[in-house]
Curated annotation (Swiss-Prot):
Region: Disordered, residue numbers: 1-31
Alphabetized UniProt keyword annotations: Chromosome, Developmental protein, Differentiation, DNA condensation, DNA-binding, Nucleosome core, Nucleus, Spermatogenesis
Subcellular location: Nucleus; Chromosome
Tissue occurrence: Testis.
Organism of provenance: Clupea harengus (Atlantic herring)
Coiled coil stretches, renumbered: none
Protein name: Protamine-Z
Something else known: Clupeine Z is probably the result of a crossover between the genes for clupeines YI and YII.
GO biological process: cell differentiation; chromosome condensation; spermatogenesis
MF-aspect GO terms: DNA binding
Biological role stated in the UniProt entry: Protamines substitute for histones in the chromatin of sperm during the haploid phase of spermatogenesis. They compact sperm DNA into a highly condensed, stable and inactive complex.
Amino acid sequence: ARRRRSRRASRPVRRRRPRRVSRRRRARRRR
């Protein structure tokens, strides 16, 4: 599953997990 992030690999960014996030916002960020 890490290979799927190869597209974002060009941008070094740490995986951030917000403490409280609405399920609707999560579905919107899941592109």
